[in-house]
Amino acid sequence: MKKLTIISLALGLLMNTEAAVAQESVIQSTALKLPVGTFANMKRTTFDPTKHGFKFSNEFQTQIQIAGLNGPRFGGLCGGMVYSALDYYKTNEPIPAQTHRPASGTTLHQYILTRQNNSTLLNSNGGSNADKWAELILNPFGWRTNEFFNWGLQGSNGGRVQELVEMMRSGSPVPLGLFKDGNGGVGPHHQVLAIGYDLGRYKGDLGDYKEDFKIFIYDPNYPNQTMTLRVNPAAQNYYYQERPDNKWLTYFVDKKYTVARPPAISSTPLANDGLVRQLLIEIGTGGDDLRGGNDNVNVIVKYTDGSTDIYPTVNKRVRWMDNYKESVLLSLRRAAPLGQIKCVMLQTTFGGGIGGDNWNVDLLRIVAKSSDQERVVFAQTGSPLVRFDGNNRPFEAVLR
């Protein structure tokens, strides 16, 4: 697992959302500065959130561990999802079709995590957005609040409107950083993808018709939707037309993005025979985590004829942190009618007690997938539903 730097994770804490790099090419902004009133009034790229965006929401959580102890925890990998979606788009690769958030340790999760690191600090071209965030955070007594807000409306002298227009001339979407004021500058901030803009009657001159200005957004917090970033000059904020409670003081144009080759994640259509071919298993860890390493969990699928299939180490030897849900998609080795699948069992591999591991499972939900339907076949919760304490007795979920 490629580890994030402590500095990058610290930036991740500031951007807590209400959620191997190769073949690189740098997006270059046009060197020629555009005089006020000469840029294109509107621009839409071909990026469509329903086609090019992820189908799952940005509900990730990540926790720093220091000397084996659980440290700070932050939510959301918005920058990683934005960079990754743009990678798939620019390399003409199909974005993964899965609707569930990828579990910790999976190929897609690791890639998004790496791209989160790139988006905040350590980009592969040596660039960094740390200076952008730091400048906005350092605003004692709000002395620069008006200035920061106006940057988002300036169409000249390096203003954000000018940067956005110049970078979108080529038809490429552009990542944005959204800065939320207050709370001592610690956010929650956000990262999104600008996929178009419309100036309306606004000229980029800080004059009339500021309210006309719109930026069309792919936001990983809102899959399959196009959000519209609008301006409220009286309140000095930028907000979503569709969700006015989402608002920020200002934004910046991310000119440090470099494209990378994303992983190919297969999604073969299920055979049209009505048989259950996949099980989506959602496991909510309670107040005691699954350690990973040598302490893991296996899934056993048992059929009515007495046969079983074992899927070992479904957590991929990665820690599943407390009070967090992970999802595992099993492609069954033996497709079968639902009535022939008797139960699904969770079996741990560790010893309990001092020096061992204990694991609380508060939620277990199982969805059976065939070509024509998805059906919830087990759903139970508890506090905990089951505690694995080293006796290695499996928990049996009888399907309905």
Specify the residue positions occupied by each region the protein language model found.
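Sec/Tat signal peptide C-region and signal peptidase I cleavage site
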Residues: 18-22
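Cysteine-nucleophile protease catalytic domains, especially the papain-like/related folds used
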Residues: 45-157
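Short, hydrophobic/aromatic-rich segments at coil-to-beta transitions
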Residues: 168-177, 212-216, 342-345
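Bacterial N-terminal signal peptides
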Residues: 8-16
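Active-site-adjacent substructure of cysteine-protease-like catalytic cores
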Residues: 152-207
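Cys-His-centered catalytic/binding microenvironment captured across papain-like cysteine peptidases
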Residues: 185-189, 198-277
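Positively charged n-region of N-terminal signal peptides that target proteins for export
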Residues: 1-4
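Regulatory, non-catalytic segments
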Residues: 273-400
